């Protein structure tokens, strides 16, 4: 999350730490990054994806054996940006534990399901929504046809991954993602997007 985006969320609290060498202040997100916590808040786009990918790679370099916590409150966004995050989550050595706090829709829900099996969580009043890939091509008919073929290929790719991550049959995933498919936290658990609904830390 960039400084400009965090400013848009309102006043960002600062945390002051004292040590033998004096005081140091962090914005709250940087302090939580030290605890291996990453946030995806708002739309998935190239900028947010680059920041999340950079944080994942940094935390892997700090300790490749310790889990990373990825908190998601996102309506979704760009497929290509989201796939950059997804591929990095699978690429790095540490397990990435995902947690939905609020809303995970579209690419947000896809990334929620992308967490390490057994380590995907949702808070009890969160909502999750899956649907098919969106696209908007303009221009010459031939160009639109090329884009349509690519969107259909991407749709099949994402359905296949979601079926694999959730354990649902591919035909069910295809049918459910034809339109917006909303779920409560418990329904998302039954679907296989998350492994556990938690109200308090264990």
From Swiss-Prot:
Any idea which GO molecular function terms this record carries? ATP-dependent peptidase activity; ATPase binding; serine-type endopeptidase activity
Q: Supply the SUPFAM superfamilies for this chain.
A: ClpP/crotonase (SSF52096)
Keyword Cytoplasm set for record: yes
What are the alphabetically sorted keywords of the record? Cytoplasm, Hydrolase, Protease, Serine protease
- Enzyme Commission number(s) from the entry: 3.4.21.92
Q: Does the keyword Protease apply?
A: yes
This protein's GO cellular component annotations are: cytoplasm; endopeptidase Clp complex
Q: List the Gene3D superfamilies.
A: 2-enoyl-CoA Hydratase, Chain A, domain 1
* Catalytic residues in the record: 106 (nucleophile), 131
**What catalytic activity does the UniProt entry give for this protein?**
Hydrolysis of proteins to small peptides in the presence of ATP and magnesium. alpha-casein is the usual test substrate. In the absence of ATP, only oligopeptides shorter than five residues are hydrolyzed (such as succinyl-Leu-Tyr-|-NHMec, and Leu-Tyr-Leu-|-Tyr-Trp, in which cleavage of the -Tyr-|-Leu- and -Tyr-|-Trp bonds also occurs)
What InterPro entries does the record point to? Answer: ClpP, ClpP/crotonase-like_dom_sf, ClpP/TepA
Pfam families hit by this protein: CLP_protease
CDD domains documented for this protein: S14_ClpP_2
Q: Which domain of life is it from?
A: Bacteria
What GO biological process term is on the record, naming one?
protein quality control for misfolded or incompletely synthesized proteins
Tell me where in or outside the cell this protein is found: Cytoplasm
Family statement drawn from the similarity comment of this UniProt entry: Belongs to the peptidase S14 family.
What PANTHER family is this protein classified in?
ATP-DEPENDENT CLP PROTEASE PROTEOLYTIC SUBUNIT
- Share what the entry says about its subunit structure, partners included: Fourteen ClpP subunits assemble into 2 heptameric rings which stack back to back to give a disk-like structure with a central cavity, resembling the structure of eukaryotic proteasomes.
Q: Which function does this protein serve?
A: Cleaves peptides in various proteins in a process that requires ATP hydrolysis. Has a chymotrypsin-like activity. Plays a major role in the degradation of misfolded proteins.
What is the protein's given name? Answer: ATP-dependent Clp protease proteolytic subunit
Q: Which organism is it from?
A: Acidovorax ebreus (strain TPSY) (Diaphorobacter sp. (strain TPSY))
